[in-house]
Amino acid sequence: MKIHCQPCAQGPGAWAHAYGVLKTLHEASQPRLHTWVDSPEEADLILLCNPIQKQGDTSGAHPLRRRFPNKTFILHDDWKTPIRYPGIYANAPRGAFWKGRFRTASYALHHPDFKNPYVQAYQPAQGLPPERRDILFSFAGRNCHPVRERLFQLRFQRPDILVRDTSTFDAFKHSAEGKDPAQREYFELSLRCKYILCPRGVGPNSIRLFEALQLGIAPIILADAWIPPEGPDWEKFALFVKEGDVDRIEEIATAHEGEFIERGREALRAHEAFFAPHAYFNYLVSAADSIRRHRIIPESVMQASVRLGNGLRKLARKLPGGAA
């Protein structure tokens, strides 16, 4: 397919880091299934990235979304996203019509400053043999959701479970000052784990979930609203625990302890097939094409209905007795 990509804003001061990542991912894609084109008219699909700018959400005003509504898709990896237009979102909404207009992304388009460099540089040869994986599961993260708050309150019977509140650590700053020791510690701790716990945070998706796959470690997913990305057979490697069962997390992980080696292998296979740098551009295109083929209502019709509704509301305000 022919693919055209643009950041949602251009010029001095515009945020466009995801565009550069996309370009690199396309160049690295294996096999090279798709052609990068400069002409939106020529493209089969249009991918718009960095919708959130300093002035807020800019996706609605982008001219390509209006000109080519049925082949234009938003890419975004933030936690709190104004999800109005079809696309691939890290935190895609769960609802009656989610499958028709949205798919779930990883955090591959995150700004490089926000990624753990040790995880990004990981090679399978760095992995520890099973006998040195001495932690049943771990979680180190911010206290930013009730399910995490409950997790931090738990008292575990097993000494090989590590749960830490790291709310004082800010991974989402551009400066590297003070980040290296914590990032190295997180990486080294993860390598010792049989499972990595991935509770939801501000959004249902978790960066550490995809880090776990990259490290060949099976995730325990504690996020009822999370929509699994299409492609991987998640049941082969992930353990899903309902948020209401957080008190049973130790019991559930213990019951599956003997499966960690094979689940870890399957997790790494999923990463290599769908989320690794050589695979992710193809995954995004496949997800966008899936939306185009399966959505219930064409986007052009959705946009026309929104414009009609806005027009009727404006007219109603002008009529006698209408709202001022």
Spans of features found by a protein language model:
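Nucleotide-sugar donor-binding catalytic core of glycosyltransferases
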Residues: 1-207, 215, 223-236, 256, ...
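C-terminal "capping" alpha-helix adjacent to the active site of nucleotide-linked donor transferases
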Residues: 240-261
